[in-house]
A protein has these predicted regions:
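Interdomain/boundary linker segments immediately adjacent to catalytic/signaling cores
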Residues: 1-30, 34
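Non-catalytic C-terminal interaction segments of nucleic acid-processing enzymes
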Residues: 3-7, 122-152
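A short acidic/basic microdomain associated with nuclease active sites
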Residues: 34-54
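Conserved catalytic cores of phosphodiester-cleaving nucleases, focusing on short active-site segments
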Residues: 36, 59-83, 100
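A generic structural motif
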Residues: 49, 64-66, 124-127
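Short, solvent-exposed loop/turn segments that connect beta-strands within catalytic domains
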Residues: 54-55, 66-70, 128-134
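Catalytic cores of nucleic-acid endonucleases
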Residues: 78-129
């Protein structure tokens, strides 16, 4: 099983903060990174902060698709369990989308990337302390960028 071999054998990255939510989010990002790597993706960066003056301006993960032609900005959302009353993408609200749009534009300009790019959301359902492997939903090409959007 990919999860047991990839996540449990390596020491998970922990943020400086001792908050439980930060640890859970970091664990979810570790799980998502292992999932993408096992699908043939290349992780370019994690917890990338392209906007120097805004500490909220963070991209959870930047990856290259298996064909290496597309840069994918990934937002990871970690939940203890699925909720029957909540939409899976409610965690990415208008304010978060605006921050992500600014962060992605900053990264694209900094790297001078003129190729294809998109925005994905990965949701991880599970607990760090649970013996059961987490469930993962990968939503590709979530509409974050306006149609035909270019910044140059």
């Amino acid at each position: 099983m990919w999860f047991a071999t990839a996540v449990f054998k390596k020491k998970p990255s922990m943020p400086d903060s001792g908050h439980e939510n930060a640890r859970t989010g970091s664990w979810g990002e570790d799980v998502a990174a292992c999932f993408l790597q096992n699908c043939g993706w290349k992780i370019v960066g994690r917890r990338v902060r392209p906007c120097m003056r805004d500490r909220r301006c963070e991209i959870d993960m930047i990856a290259r698709s298996p064909d290496r032609q597309t840069v994918v900005f990934v937002e990871v959302k970690t939940h203890a369990a699925r909720s029957p009353r909540a939409s899976p993408l409610w965690g990415v609200d208008r304010r978060k989308k605006n921050v992500l749009l600014r962060a992605c534009a900053s990264w694209l300009m900094w790297e001078k990337w003129h190729g294809n790019f998109r925005f994905d959301v990965i949701e991880v359902f599970g607990r760090r302390t649970s013996p059961r492997p987490p469930e993962i939903d990968h939503f590709e090409n979530v509409p974050l960028f306006p149609p035909k959007w270019r910044f140059w």
